[in-house]
Structure formats: C-alpha cells, structure tokens
Amino acid sequence: MVENPYEEVQVNVLSRIIANVEKLNQSVRTLNQELENVNKRNKNLEVMGQICENYHRSVQFNLEATGNKKPPL
C-alpha cells in the first residue's frame, strides 16, 4: 500500500481550517449578540422619540384649542 506523502500536510491544513472556522463562528456569535443589544437600545430610543413626538402634538393641539399658540420667535 502506497502512503500519501502529503497526508500529514493535508491533516495539518485541515486542522488549521477547522480551528479558524471555529474562531470565525465564535466571532459571528459575539457580533450577533452585540447587534441584538444595539437593536434593543435603538428600540428604547425609538419609543422615547415617539413619546416626545406625541407630547409635542398634544401640546400643539392644546395651545391651538385654547388660543394660546404663538408664532415662533
């Protein structure tokens, strides 16, 4: 039986590829977790923006309804 003279090199290369793919997968998992955190914070900002916008509309409505709305300075 003839042995493959490149077998050891191929095994080493495959081992390095597998190790690098595992590192890449871990990095992608970490990135996904951070993106989830960013999305949660952005959602909170979006809600706060909607609250401020609704408050502004309410104030404008009440100023118009009471006749107290004045032009900007």
Curated annotation (Swiss-Prot):
Coiled-coil stretches noted in the UniProt entry, renumbered to this chain: 14-54
Entry keywords, A to Z: Cell cycle, Cell division, Centromere, Chromosome, Chromosome partition, Coiled coil, Cytoplasm, Cytoskeleton, Kinetochore, Microtubule, Mitosis, Nucleus
Described function: Component of the DASH complex that connects microtubules with kinetochores and couples microtubule depolymerisation to chromosome movement; it is involved in retrieving kinetochores to the spindle poles before their re-orientation on the spindle in early mitosis and allows microtubule depolymerization to pull chromosomes apart and resist detachment during anaphase.
Q: Which organism is it from?
A: Candida glabrata (strain ATCC 2001 / BCRC 20586 / JCM 3761 / NBRC 0622 / NRRL Y-65 / CBS 138) (Yeast)
How this chain assembles, per its entry, is: Component of the DASH complex consisting of ASK1, DAD1, DAD2, DAD3, DAD4, DAM1, DUO1, HSK3, SPC19 and SPC34, with a stoichiometry of one copy of each subunit per complex. Multiple DASH complexes oligomerize to form a ring that encircles spindle microtubules and organizes the rod-like NDC80 complexes of the outer kinetochore. DASH complex oligomerization strengthens microtubule attachments. On cytoplasmic microtubules, DASH complexes appear to form patches instead of rings.
- Localized where? Nucleus; Cytoplasm, Cytoskeleton, Spindle; Chromosome, Centromere, Kinetochore
Signal peptide (UniProt feature, chain positions): none
- Cellular component GO terms held in the UniProt record: cytoplasm; DASH complex; microtubule; mitotic spindle
Molecular-function GO terms, alphabetical: microtubule plus-end binding
Q: Which family does it belong to?
A: Belongs to the DASH complex DAD4 family.
Q: What is its main location?
A: nucleus
Looking up InterPro entries in the UniProt record yields: DASH_Dad4
Q: Name one Pfam family in it.
A: DASH_Dad4
Q: What is the protein's name according to its record?
A: DASH complex subunit DAD4
A Gene Ontology biological process in which this protein takes part is: protein transport along microtubule to mitotic spindle pole body
